[in-house]
């Protein structure tokens, strides 16, 4: 039918052309095609990428993780996670008949799905999977269709999938290739809108599709698949573009080359494909808007116009359209094209003087197929033979080649030849480059005069088949089918023709660099005729034009116009400068040129045909911009002149059937066809043999225009062209995406030895060593040189105020000194009148330092000036360097013990104090009540096998246990020997043990008898000799139980029995009796600091305790922060009225008097009368601090102050009764991260942790590297029982073995007979600790008191215990006795200020206390080093003036001050009269502290010097005399945290603390001694296969796979954001370094030659500090992952140069002190994950502080955690088979307080929910938490777990939280 249609089309076209209506008919067809293209509307499509939230239009919208947008689409990496409900992605209105249009490129070969649609029941409904070599369409569960299409070849693929009914069709090549598959099943009616649409994978745990995707659209109209190329986005054609620096393909007449900018991928030419139809089944040729006429002068013919988007290629009917019509001419040009692209022209009728030249269309396939093979590129071979050379026969086969005759070479024939396999494929010379592989490499430079041939490349396209449909086999003859389609129907070949062999699919260089223009007719060659020609190839036309042509005469061309191109008058020909010799190999050459760039001056060539060259001097870059929109169809132009014969076009798609033609003449009988494939329907008969070919019918009418051809695959890369001139500079491209970080390169060879370097800087000193023993005092040395200024020390804690010193004597005024450096702060001069506040001046420039002046003598104290106004509060200055730690001050006076105040609210838990010395053993306390039984602890590891101990004494008979659960029914035993009937007599002696009997016959199972009464145990007989092991007898029926005999004496101890199989856990036994209270043990070592427990509920207030004895005076603690403003006190009692005093006049201000001795407290006088209001006096000077007065009466109780430091724990008080259970407090917000404190002492050992719950099985990790040999693991779960083995032969009796390891408890047996008490047996070996039993109901009697055991060794440090469950409310306890007075405890560290307490009730008035003795004068502390001058602070805002302070005591006379500057005269007011004294008012509220005023000591009196310029900071002066204590300053703002100071000396012990609260429940006691091992039983029969064991827990990390080859080095990424500051205080360090550099020559170049002087001049502490800082910085730059040198996160270790393996490392996210480093597991296989393991696998607790966790959250972008709940008959997530959550579904609390729950906003991924199966066996439910909000993980609690009972249990298995 196809052949007939083609012939009909040709015939019609030829007839139309013959009638002269060719141009009109072409114009009608072109207009009709334009109308169709402009009116055809695209159906509504669904853009899947846009529905998934990926859009090119939203500028700046962030892409999801793992998705990288680029110009043409999106790149999906392994981290891409795209999932959405099906209803939101694929609307239900689309229906079931869909068309999927795809444009993609795979980057990784795997088995990934491009997409998958799953229903709510998680069944696969629709999916597309790319396998290596296959493309599989999944249409349901286990329903799929596979196509032979390899998507993993690294190329871009544009295809469509049509789903219509029961047919699935793969459409490629823009609709020219269609592979339909009929489904043997029905598809699902519709997609479940409530399901899920997963992009890139089949399920959340499957492998991810990695590649680029330009378009993924779904159309509801299935016809879209046939012309899907019209619906492709224009960016998809540019998806795989590149700019190739190709040289000029054509030379201009002016000689200037031009530049190509080729883009193969844009043209779709990475793998050119052609379709090879059967013989004679192709139309003559196709062009975009024209027709192709044959070269025959009398019968021009044409074909129907094709789709306007379709172009044709050189090579005849076996070509595929290459370019869409939307591309401009510059874009369509490509030197790789083996065809002329564009509209074809009508062939002109050649005159007699014109040589008729024809084009031979040949191909070079990879193989000669026996079936319709993959198409291959057609090449036009051109060769100019010598005139004397005969035409070489073309390599056509006998079955397809028309009859040819050898023509003389008078008409300059150009025969077509194809290289044969026997000949060398390519004759390379040294100058010819090797053919590159099929990639996108540029062509070598080539011109028409170049001597280097242009190799061409032919490729084949992979054959697309389906497993459901086989292509029909092509008819074969005795010879192989031809590699191309012949153009004539003559059956007999010429005698000179040869059979076509398989030409190699290699690049064959041509003999000349000729080129054919894009739209100009190609140079014809003999041996080929246009389609439809009835003449033999090369016969008629060649003979007519042959004699009139000469070898060197140019071939003139008739002027004409090509369709939609420039006139042919613009074309020029130029002779080829080089003519090949006859011996040259004839090779095909690619010819291509755009017609609009050809000139019109023909030049003769030596070979007789023209070479076209470009006209003009304008270079034409191919990629000047993206293709513009499709223009409107223009009006038909006037008919052009006839052109040269066109080359046959590619086969178009099959058109609609035309009208039936008249019956043709009967044709010759054809060969019998092959047997057809069997039909799909069962029972249908096989297809019969194919009938003979019918007679050719009449030519039908031309069909409508075919569909647009698909975009061809990119062709192979040719040789590089010559280097062209550089093109115009392009616009800057978009910023590329950062490439992946390359692997570290190999370690290079060591370089040559360098020259000797300069003397390096002095090395850094190490950390300060420990203090050595104090040596003998040395001889006083000479006064040394002034040392360099040291780094300021750490600020010490504020010491207590010292005593006021005596006033110094007045010194004589010294001589005037040289003006010195500008000092820090001038001394206070005579105070003038207050002047007006001036404006703030500008900051002065820093002056040069002046010379240092001599120290002046002590000046005469100046006259005290008038007090000035209170100054403004200065701005906050920069924090100073830490000062040196102050010495502890003198002890204060012992005060009387005040009255006991009301208990304040509980403050926060303080830090643990230092470990005190162990105290003496106290008296034994009263026996306490037995505590509540704790939860079962974790099972310990199996200890070493102990030696067999001596026989122990017999234990007391225990209470009768509860009956155990009924065991599994055993196999029926052998029938017992029937006893003789008789009266039951006394039991006789037990006879000797007989030999084992032979195996009895298998007896029938007897009826199970009723259970008899329990009898007495008979006496054990004498053990007989051990017999040989007999074969186990077959089980018989259960015999009736015999009567109980009396209990016999215990037998001797038998050998240890074989380890039995682990039985099921028995019921919980009753509670044992409470043991006697043991003696008080020694004080254990301090445990680690426990985790803060949850806030307890408010307890019941206890009775008020007795007044304790007076404790020792404690050392004053450090000054606490200022407390909050207290409430105003209550008014005191009113005193008696005093007499009214006369108003005194205001006297002159006297000098300050000396400090008076403290007077005795006088008695309170009577209240006087109100005096007249006095005149307010002037503000007096601040007096010196007076001596402390006598202690006054105890005032009323003030408001609660801040919480003081926590003292050491006092002696243990008596056990109080349990308080009421307090209410649960709300979780407070996380506080700000505090300053890293000094590492505290090692805490006390924690309690034994409880046994954790079994965690979830984690996801299978990647295979890690081989780790070190680990400790023996716990026993695994029971495996699946294997098949029962055959009975083994009887082995020899083995020697008695050593006692085996403790076996796991076996199955519960039947109740045994109660025996008599046996003698004391030897003590057995120590057994394993049994599992915790359940609480019993009965309470046993107390056991006898045990002996006092020896003091045990110090145990290993236990893990911190869990917070205990809140206890029940206890009974009010009796008042305890006052405890003994304890030793003073050490002062604890300074605590944080507690919350402001509520106002306490007024306490009773205390008695008059005795006057305390004056304290001793403390030793004067050492003088601290002067700190450097601080940076001048910024000007602060003017504060509010504070209220006037109380007048201070009269101070001592100050020293003479310097003469101050004259102040501006202020307004002097007259003094008012003194008023009457007013009524005494109530005490006012305490005002806010006033602003700090400037105060200075009086300076020396000297002449005023000239004001010098402000100098730089001078050297620190000599140590000055200690000054008097200044006024307390205002509380400054919080400074920056200073560097951690060195550990201070241990302070004296503090006061005895209050009685502590009752401690938590202790760990469970040790397991008792193991009982006597019973006798070894005989080997029992094989048991029934056990039930399937539980799924094992997650295994350890596997071995790391071998290191893969290093990937290509990625492009450098964009510059990263500026790095944050290091955790060190850079301001401090920078100032310290600057000070050191400014004040020393250590870093100056001239100092290198004096290293000795440098070392002598520096202090040791400076270098120690520098050395420490250098090591610290080096450890931060290159972390090792150790505890001493941790990394921030594991990813920092992976970025280091050395290769790291998966394992355990130490990290410190906040890079603070190394004491808070945490141990994590680093998973470098998964990109450097930081996996934080829980403390135990059964609890959601992690050993990390909240500060470190906050930093870890900030350093991470995503986190994953797995939690598995193992359950027994317990539902934790969903009930039954539905999707409804259970009533008691568990909830998970995240780190940030959010809740993960079923149906909530945050839900975990539940990959397996086995807990909904309740069949009496253990199951598990796996929860996966994967989030990109690191604040959510790890999970900190699992809530709503149902309570465990005997039949319902659960265990938690908590996996690590892995941060990335």
UniProtKB/Swiss-Prot annotation:
Q: Where is this region: Triple-helical region?
A: 625-1618
Q: Where is the Fibrillar collagen NC1 domain?
A: 1660-1860
Q: Where is the Collagen-like domain?
A: 625-679, 688-747, 748-807, 808-867, 871-930, 931-990, 1003-1062, 1066-1125, 1126-1185, 1192-1251, 1258-1317, 1318-1378, 1382-1441, 1442-1501, 1502-1561, 1562-1621
Q: Which residues carry a glycan? A: 271, 1769
One GO term under biological process is: skeletal system development
Report the record's disulfide bonds.
1690-1722, 1731-1858, 1767-1811
- Pfam families found in the cross-reference section: COLFI, Collagen
What SUPFAM superfamilies is this protein classified in?
Answer: Concanavalin A-like lectins/glucanases
Give the matching SMART domains. COLFI, TSPN
- The secretion signal range is 1-41
Q: Does the keyword rRNA-binding apply?
A: no
Per the entry, what this protein does is: Plays a role during the calcification of cartilage and the transition of cartilage to bone.
How does the entry describe the domains? The C-terminal propeptide, also known as COLFI domain, have crucial roles in tissue growth and repair by controlling both the intracellular assembly of procollagen molecules and the extracellular assembly of collagen fibrils. It binds a calcium ion which is essential for its function.
Disease affiliated with this protein: Steel syndrome: A syndrome characterized by dislocated hips and radial heads, fusion of carpal bones, short stature, scoliosis, and cervical spine anomalies. Facial features include prominent forehead, long oval-shaped face, hypertelorism and broad nasal bridge.
Q: What protein name does the entry list?
A: Collagen alpha-1(XXVII) chain
């Amino acid at each position: 039918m196809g052949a007939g249609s083609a012939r009909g089309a040709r015939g019609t076209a030829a007839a139309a052309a013959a009638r002269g209506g060719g141009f009109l008919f072409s114009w009608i067809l072109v207009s009709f095609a334009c109308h169709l293209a402009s009116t055809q509307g695209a159906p509504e499509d669904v853009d899947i990428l846009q529905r998934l939230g990926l859009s090119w239009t939203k500028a700046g919208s962030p892409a999801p993780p793992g998705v990288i947008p680029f110009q043409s689409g999106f790149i999906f990496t392994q981290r891409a996670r795209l999932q959405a409900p099906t209803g939101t992605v694929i609307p239900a209105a689309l229906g079931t008949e869909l068309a999927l249009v795809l444009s993609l490129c795979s980057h990784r070969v795997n088995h990934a799905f491009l997409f998958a649609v799953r229903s709510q029941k998680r069944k696969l409904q629709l999916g597309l999977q790319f396998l290596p070599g296959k493309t599989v369409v999944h249409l349901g569960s286990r329903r799929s269709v596979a196509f032979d299409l390899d998507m993993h070849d690294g190329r871009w693929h544009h295809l469509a999938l049509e789903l219509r009914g029961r047919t699935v069709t793969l459409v490629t090549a823009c609709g020219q290739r269609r592979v339909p598959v009929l489904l043997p099943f029905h598809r699902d009616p519709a997609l479940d809108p409530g399901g899920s649409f997963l992009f890139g994978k089949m399920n959340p745990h499957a492998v991810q599709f990695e590649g680029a995707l330009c378009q993924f659209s779904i159309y509801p109209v299935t016809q879209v698949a046939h012309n899907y190329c019209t619906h492709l986005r224009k960016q998809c054609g540019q998806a795989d573009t590149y700019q190739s620096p190709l040289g000029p393909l054509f030379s201009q007449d002016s000689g200037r080359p031009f530049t190509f900018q080729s883009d193969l991928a844009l043209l779709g030419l990475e793998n050119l494909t052609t379709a090879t139809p059967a013989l004679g089944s192709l139309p003559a040729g196709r062009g975009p808007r024209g027709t192709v006429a044959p070269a025959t002068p009398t019968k021009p013919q044409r074909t129907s116009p094709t789709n306007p988007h379709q172009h044709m290629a050189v090579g005849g009917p076996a070509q595929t359209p290459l370019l869409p019509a939307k591309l401009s001419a510059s874009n369509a040009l490509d030197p790789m094209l083996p065809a002329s692209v564009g509209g074809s022209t009508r062939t002109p009728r050649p005159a007699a003087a014109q040589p008729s030249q024809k084009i031979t269309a040949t191909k070079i396939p990879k193989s000669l197929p026996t079936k319709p093979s993959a198409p291959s590129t057609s090449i036009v071979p051109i060769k100019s033979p010598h005139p004397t050379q005969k035409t070489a026969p073309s390599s056509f086969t006998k079955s397809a080649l028309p009859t040819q005759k050898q023509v003389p070479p008078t008409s300059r024939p150009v025969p077509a030849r194809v290289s044969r396999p026997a000949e060398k494929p390519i004759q390379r010379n040294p100058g010819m480059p090797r053919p590159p592989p099929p990639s996108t490499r540029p062509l070598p430079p080539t011109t028409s005069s170049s001597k280097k041939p242009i190799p061409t490349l032919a490729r084949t396209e992979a054959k697309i088949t389906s497993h459901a449909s086989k292509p029909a086999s092509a008819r074969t003859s005795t010879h192989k089918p031809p590699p191309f389609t012949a153009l004539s129907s003559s059956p007999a070949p010429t005698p000179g023709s040869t059979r076509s062999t398989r030409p190699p699919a290699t690049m064959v260089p041509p003999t000349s660099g000729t080129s054919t223009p894009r739209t100009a007719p190609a140079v014809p060659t003999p041996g080929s005729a246009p389609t439809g020609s009835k003449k033999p190839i090369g016969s008629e036309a060649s003979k007519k034009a042959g004699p009139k042509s000469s070898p060197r005469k140019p071939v003139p061309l008739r002027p004409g116009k090509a369709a939609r191109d420039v006139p042919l008058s613009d074309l020029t020909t130029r002779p080829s400068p080089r003519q090949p010799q006859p011996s040259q190999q004839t090779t095909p050459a690619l010819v291509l040129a755009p017609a609009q760039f050809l000139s019109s001056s023909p030049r003769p060539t030596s070979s007789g045909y023209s070479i076209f060259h470009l006209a003009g001097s304008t270079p034409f870059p191919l990629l000047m911009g993206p293709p513009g929109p499709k223009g409107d169809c223009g009006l038909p132009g006037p008919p052009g002149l006839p052109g040269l014969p066109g080359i046959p076009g590619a086969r178009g798609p099959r058109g609609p059937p035309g009208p039936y033609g008249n019956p043709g003449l009967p044709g010759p009988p054809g060969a019998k066809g092959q047997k057809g494939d069997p039909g799909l329907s069962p029972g249908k008969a096989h297809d019969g043999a194919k009938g003979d070919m019918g007679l050719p019918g009449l030519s039908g009418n031309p069909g409508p225009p075919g569909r647009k051809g698909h975009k061809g695959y990119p062709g192979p890369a040719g040789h590089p062209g010559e280097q062209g001139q550089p093109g115009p500079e392009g616009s800057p491209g978009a910023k590329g995406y950062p490439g992946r970080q390359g692997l570290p390169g190999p370690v290079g060879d060591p370089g040559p030895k360098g020259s000797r370097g300069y003397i390096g800087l002095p090395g850094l000193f190490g950390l300060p060593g420990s203090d050595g023993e104090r040596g003998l005092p040395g001889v006083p040395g000479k006064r040394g040189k002034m040392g360099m200024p040291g780094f300021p020390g750490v600020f010490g804690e504020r010491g207590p105020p010292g005593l006021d010193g005596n006033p110094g004597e007045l010194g004589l005024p010294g001589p005037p000194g040289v003006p010195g450096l500008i000092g820090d702060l001038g001394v206070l001069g005579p105070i003038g009148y207050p002047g007006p506040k001036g404006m703030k001046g500008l900051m002065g420039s820093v002056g040069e330092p002046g010379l240092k002046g001599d120290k002046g003598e002590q000046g005469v104290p100046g006259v005290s000036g008038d007090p000035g106004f209170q100054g403004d509060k200065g701005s906050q200055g920069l924090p100073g360097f830490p000062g040196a730690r102050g010495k502890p001050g003198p002890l204060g006076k012992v005060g009387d013990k005040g009255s006991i105040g009301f208990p304040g609210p509980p403050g926060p838990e303080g830090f643990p104090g230092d470990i005190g010395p162990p105290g003496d053993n106290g008296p034994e306390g009263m026996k306490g009540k037995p505590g509540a039984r704790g939860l079962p602890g974790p099972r310990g590891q199996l200890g070493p096998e102990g030696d067999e101990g001596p026989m122990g004494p017999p234990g007391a008979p225990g209470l009768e246990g509860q009956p155990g659960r009924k065991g599994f029914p055993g196999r029926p035993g052998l029938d017992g020997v029937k006893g003789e009937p008789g009266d039951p007599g006394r039991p006789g002696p037990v006879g000797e043990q007989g030999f084992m009997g032979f195996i009895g016959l298998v007896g029938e199972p007897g009826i199970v008898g009723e259970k008899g009464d329990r009898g007495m145990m008979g006496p054990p007989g004498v053990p007989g000799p051990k017999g040989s092991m007999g074969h186990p007898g077959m089980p018989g029926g259960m015999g009736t139980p015999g009567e109980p005999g009396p209990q016999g004496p215990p037998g001797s101890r038998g050998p240890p029995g074989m380890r039995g199989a682990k039985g099921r856990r028995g019921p919980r036994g009753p509670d044992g009796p409470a043991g006697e209270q043991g003696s008080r043990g020694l004080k254990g070592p301090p445990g680690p600091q426990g985790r803060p427990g949850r806030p307890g509920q408010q307890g019941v207030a206890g009775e008020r305790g007795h007044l304790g004895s007076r404790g020792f005076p404690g050392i004053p603690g450090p000054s606490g922060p200022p407390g909050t403003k207290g409430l105003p006190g209550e008014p005191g009692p009113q005193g008696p009225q005093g007499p009214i005093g006369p108003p005194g006049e205001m006297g002159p201000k006297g000098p300050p008097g000396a400090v008076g001795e403290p007077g005795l407290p006088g008695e309170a006088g009577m209240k006087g009368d109100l005096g007249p209001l006095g005149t307010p006096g002037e503000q007096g000077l601040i007096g010196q601090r007076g001596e402390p007065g006598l202690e006054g009466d105890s005032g009323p109780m003030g408001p609660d102050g801040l919480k003081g430091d926590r003292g050491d724990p006092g002696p243990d008080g008596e056990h109080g009764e349990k308080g009421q259970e307090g209410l649960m407090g709300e979780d407070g917000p996380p506080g700000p991260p505090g300053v890293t404190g000094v590492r505290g002492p090692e805490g006390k050992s924690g309690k034994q942790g409880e046994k954790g719950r079994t965690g979830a099985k984690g996801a299978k990790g990647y295979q890690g590297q081989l780790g070190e040999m680990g400790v023996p693991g716990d026993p695994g779960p029971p495996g699946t029982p294997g098949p029962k083995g055959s009975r083994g032969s009887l082995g020899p009796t083995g020697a008695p073995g050593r006692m085996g390891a403790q076996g796991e408890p076996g199955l519960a047996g039947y109740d045994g007979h109660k025996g008599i008490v046996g003698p004391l047996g030897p003590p057995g070996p120590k057994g394993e600790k049994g599992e915790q039993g359940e609480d019993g109901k009965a309470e046993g009697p107390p056991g006898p008191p045990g002996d006092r055991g020896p003091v045990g060794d110090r145990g290993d440090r236990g893990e911190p215990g869990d917070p205990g469950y809140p206890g029940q409310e206890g009974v009010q306890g009796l008042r305890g006795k006052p405890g003994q007075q304890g030793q003073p405890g050490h002062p604890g560290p300074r605590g944080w200020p507690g919350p402001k307490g509520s106002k306490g009730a007024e306490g009773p008035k205390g008695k008059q206390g005795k006057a305390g003795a004056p304290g001793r004068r403390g030793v004067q502390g050492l003088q601290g080093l002067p700190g450097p001058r601080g940076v001048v602070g910024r000007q602060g805002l003017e504060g509010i003036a504070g209220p006037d302070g109380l007048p201070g005591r009269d101070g001592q006379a100050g020293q003479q001050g310097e003469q101050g500057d004259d102040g501006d005269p202020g307004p002097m007011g007259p003094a008012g009269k003194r008023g009457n004294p007013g009524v005494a008012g109530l005490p006012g509220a305490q005002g806010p502290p006033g602003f700090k005023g400037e105060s200075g000591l009086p300076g020396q009196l000297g002449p005023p010097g000239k004001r010098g310029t402000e100098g730089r900071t001078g050297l620190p002066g000599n140590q000055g005399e200690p000054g008097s204590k200044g006024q307390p300053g205002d509380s400054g703002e919080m400074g920056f945290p200073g560097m951690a100071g060195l550990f201070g000396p241990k302070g004296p012990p503090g006061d005895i603390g209050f009685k502590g609260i009752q401690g938590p429940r202790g760990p469970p006691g040790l397991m008792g001694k193991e009982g006597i091992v019973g006798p070894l039983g005989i080997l029992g029969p094989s048991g029934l296969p056990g039930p399937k064991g539980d799924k094992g827990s997650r295994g350890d990390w596997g071995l790391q796979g071998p290191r893969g080859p290093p990937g290509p080095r990625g492009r450098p990424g964009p510059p990263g954001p500026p790095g944050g500051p290091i955790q060190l205080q850079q301001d401090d360090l920078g100032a310290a370094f600057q000070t050191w550099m400014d004040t020393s020559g250590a870093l100056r170049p001239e100092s290198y030659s004096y290293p000795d002087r440098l070392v002598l001049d520096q202090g040791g502490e400076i270098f120690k500090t520098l050395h420490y800082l250098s090591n610290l910085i080096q450890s931060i730059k290159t972390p090792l992952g150790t505890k001493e040198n941790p990394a921030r996160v594991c990813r920092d270790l992976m970025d280091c140069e050395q290769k790291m393996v998966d394992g355990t490392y130490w990290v410190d996210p906040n890079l603070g002190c190394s004491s808070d480093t945490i141990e994590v597991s680093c998973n470098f296989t998964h990109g450097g994950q930081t996996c934080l393991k829980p403390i135990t696998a059964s609890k959601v607790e992690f050993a990390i502080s909240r500060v470190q966790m906050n930093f870890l959250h900030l350093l991470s972008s995503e986190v994953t955690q797995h939690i598995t709940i193992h359950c027994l008959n317990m539902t934790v997530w969903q009930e039954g088979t539905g999707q409804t959550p259970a009533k008691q579904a568990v909830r998970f609390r995240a780190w940030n307080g959010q809740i993960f729950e079923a149906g909530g906003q945050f839900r975990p991924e539940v990959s397996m929910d086995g807990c909904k199966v309740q069949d009496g066996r253990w199951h598990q439910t796996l929860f996966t938490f994967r989030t990109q909000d690191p604040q959510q993980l790890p999970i900190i609690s699992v809530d709503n777990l149902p309570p465990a009972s005997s039949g319902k249990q659960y265990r938690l298995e908590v996996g690590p939280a892995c941060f990335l």
